[in-house]
Curated annotation (Swiss-Prot):
UniProt topological domain (Mitochondrial intermembrane) ranges: 1-14, 88-229
Catalytic activity: 4 Fe(II)-[cytochrome c] + O2 + 8 H(+)(in) = 4 Fe(III)-[cytochrome c] + 2 H2O + 4 H(+)(out)
Its membrane topology: Multi-pass membrane protein
PANTHER family given in the database record: CYTOCHROME C OXIDASE SUBUNIT 2, CYTOCHROME C OXIDASE, SUBUNIT II
GO biological process, one term: ATP synthesis coupled electron transport
EC number: 7.1.1.9
Location(s), subcellular: Mitochondrion inner membrane
UniProtKB keywords: Copper, Electron transport, Magnesium, Membrane, Metal-binding, Mitochondrion, Mitochondrion inner membrane, Respiratory chain, Translocase, Transmembrane, Transmembrane helix, Transport
UniProt: Mg(2+) binding residues: E198
InterPro entries with a match to the protein in the record: CcO_II, CcO_II-like_C, CcO_II_C, Copper_CuA, Cupredoxin, Cyt_c_oxidase_su2, Cyt_c_oxidase_su2_TM_dom, Cyt_c_oxidase_su2_TM_sf
Binding site for Cu cation A2: C196, E198, C200, H204
Source species taxonomy: Eukaryota, Metazoa, Chordata, Craniata, Vertebrata
Name by which UniProt lists this protein: Cytochrome c oxidase subunit 2
Organism: Pelomedusa subrufa (African side-necked turtle)
């Protein structure tokens, strides 16, 4: 869940976001070590008067600064490729949900259930119940079953949008006339907030995304309840 003045990642609620967080820490540590090495070399050059006059045939140095960057790039590329594979992997999704972006709300279609479709608008501040998230709460949340693979089909009706949930590690562009795909699984029950992450007009900041994850029996109750509306 987002918090005021937050500078770190939101708590991961999916395996993908956990891997992205680990990859960020891994890459940041490599950058930190390289920065320390460069700083040490600069300080050494500034603080000593010793010079090396025979640099024309420094084959050992050339070998080091060729092989070492290659090793560093490999240590970054391998986990990155693994995460890219996880993003595109589809492992028999439990259901498919289509999200369509409009100015400035979302439409959700549960394609596995007949005539299950609704619009999701942001709740205005003056109508917001006590304790709810300002500018992030909606009148109809997208509800999914817990620990189930969900395939998202994402498109737009008018202009470019982007469907994003930071705690799930998801950010997929919604392009008019095109359908993009994302797959996720949520490992803990809860409510997860996001926003449209593509500038889409005057009310771009008022186009939140809310996903609620429920155990399967509660999800079935939600289906029965929404069918009666």
């Amino acid at each position: 869940m987002p918090t005021p003045n937050q500078t770190n990642f939101q708590d991961a609620a999916s395996p993908l976001m956990e891997e992205l967080t680990h990859f960020h820490d891994h890459t940041l540590m490599i950058v930190f070590m390289i920065s320390l090495l460069v700083l040490y070399i600069l300080l050494s050059m500034l603080s000593t008067k010793l010079t090396h006059t025979n640099t024309a045939n420094a084959q050992q140095a050339e070998m080091v600064w060729t092989i070492l960057p290659a090793i560093i790039l490999i240590t970054i590329a391998l986990p990155s490729l693994q995460i890219l594979y996880m993003m595109d992997e589809i492992n028999k999704p439990h259901m498919t949900i289509k999200a369509i972006g409009h100015q400035w709300y979302w439409t959700y279609e549960y394609t596995d259930y007949k005539e299950l479709e609704f619009n999701s608008y942001m709740i205005q501040t003056q109508d917001l119940p006590l304790g709810h998230m300002r500018l992030l709460e909606v009148d109809h949340r997208m509800v999914t079953p817990l620990e189930s693979y969900i395939r998202m089909l994402i498109s737009a009706d008018d202009v470019l949008h982007s469907w994003a949930i930071p705690s799930l590690g998801l950010k997929t562009d919604a392009v008019p006339g095109r359908i993009n795909q994302a797959v996720f699984i949520i490992m803990q029950a809860g409510i997860f907030y996001g926003q449209c992450s593509e500038i889409c007009g005057a009310n771009h900041s008022f186009m939140p995304v809310v996903v609620e994850s429920l155990p399967m029996n509660h999800f079935d109750l939600w289906l029965a309840m929404i069918d009666t509306l």
